[in-house]
Amino acid sequence: MSTEDALCFTGEEYARHVREYWRGVAESDGFDSEDIRSPVVLTGLFHYDCQSGRRYPDPLLVKRYALLGLHRFNILQGTSFELDALQKFNKTMNLTSSYYITLLANEPGAIPLQKTFQVRVDERKYDTLDLTVAIARLKKDQNEAAETTKEPFVPHFCCSAVSDGVFQGPLPDWPSDDALRHDRNRFYELEKSEWQATDWISLYLELLILATDRGMFGVAQTGLPQVQILKVVIETEEENEKPLDKRLNARRAHVYITFTGLPKSPRLVEIGEHVERKAIIRRVIDDSGYLTLLGKFWSGKDTEQRSKTRQSEEKVESSQKRSRLC
């Protein structure tokens, strides 16, 4: 429908066309809506065919969103699917977007070898790693009843997994050396061979780097640097004394990564690939199956700034108490 036709809509007709469009999109939970035409300009989903050979936006990020969806599926189902290829994806027109990705993946020894997956990722903030995988599922074929979400379809969900304790609210500071040495039930430092065999650790770090540098000349457009991971510590619940494989797949965890190879980062003033940088990433998977990732680069200056803020707040509070006494 042309722009001129759209301008001839009455308010009631406009609302009706929009409702009909989103009703059609909702039938496939946003994944197979490319044949449904948006009735008006700037309404609807963008559609991209990853097999056409044409360029599409943020290919590095979209691929890692697909990998993150498979990661969630593997944790919850105890499988080991690996990404073969992206087929297509739809995305909302927001700056912070929701992505509906269709992909092919395989599991060694599985029959058939390739299976089609659907992954939905909702970004909560731009230029920050704050996102939720709301759907990660096998796509049903035409002879099977389609699996749908229980909630009403909302194009951009902006929801996160529910948590409590140390795994909710702002991300923590970097743990002290004393805590790392003595609180072994809570913190576990991975051996090099262990984190090298754990693909999702590098995936989380790559997502943080890409999410925080999405400008025209950022790494999301120019390419990921060759970072080198030096140290990985995983924090799980204090009473958690499970074996390593269970700890790595814990539904709630903080991952502390020390690395080099990033020329610059948004939060740190030091420039150079030689600089040791630190990243903190939280993973929460709740009972509904939502997987939320929240991450940041960390500097000791963050702690200093918070300390100064607390001192300032305490001075104000003390001054107010003295005023009331007078």
From Swiss-Prot:
Residues 301-326 are annotated as: Disordered. Residues 301-320 have a biased composition (Basic and acidic residues). It comes from the Eukaryota. This is Putative UPF0725 protein At1g28500. Pfam families: protein_MS5. Belongs to the UPF0725 (EMB2204) family.
